């Protein structure tokens, strides 16, 4: 059984027991969150277009640093910026059709 969920402007294919990094969610560690599923396919091959996915928040963190370098030739202009995107690690517990 698997489902397709949409969170943080992205879509993910998830299965029960799977760990997944998504954009930061407003939930505390240990809380259970419900995410809308846009597509669910069960073990018999039946497809449903509505449902919910139950997930547990495992941790909050930041991804690796991404460096952004701005440069203008002949003007001695150099600028280096870094960015670390926050994420939430969730564990998929159950898929409800």
From Swiss-Prot:
It holds the Pfam family Ribosomal_L21p. Keywords: Ribonucleoprotein, Ribosomal protein, RNA-binding, rRNA-binding. The keyword RNA-binding applies. GO terms for biological process: translation. One of its GO terms (cellular component) is cytoplasm. The keyword Hydrolase does not apply. One of its GO terms (molecular function) is structural constituent of ribosome. Transmembrane segments: none annotated. Part of the 50S ribosomal subunit. Contacts protein L20. Belongs to the bacterial ribosomal protein bL21 family. HAMAP family: Ribosomal_bL21. This protein binds to 23S rRNA in the presence of protein L20. This is Large ribosomal subunit protein bL21. It comes from Persephonella marina (strain DSM 14350 / EX-H1).
